[in-house]
Amino acid sequence: RGSNLTIHPLRNTNDIDY
């Protein structure tokens, strides 16, 4: 995870590392 941390949490297009 943590592929794209720049992606907004609203758009889950990429793996967001929470």
UniProtKB/Swiss-Prot annotation:
Q: What is its EC number?
A: 3.4.23.-
Question: Where does the record place a coiled coil?
Answer: none
Q: What's the chief localization of this chain?
A: secreted
List the keywords (alphabetical): Aspartyl protease, Glycoprotein, Hydrolase, Protease, Secreted
Q: Which GO terms describe its biological process?
A: proteolysis
Q: What is an example of a GO molecular function annotated in this UniProt entry?
A: aspartic-type endopeptidase activity
Q: Name one GO cellular component term.
A: extracellular region
Glycosylated residues are N4
| Subcellular localization | Secreted, Extracellular space
Tissue note: Highly expressed in the placenta between day 60 and day 100 of gestation.
Q: Which domain of life is it from?
A: Eukaryota
Which family is annotated? Answer: Belongs to the peptidase A1 family.
The further comment given in this record reads: On the 2D-gel the determined pI of this protein is: 4.0, its MW determined on 1D-gel is: 61 kDa.
UniProt protein name = Pregnancy-associated glycoprotein 61b
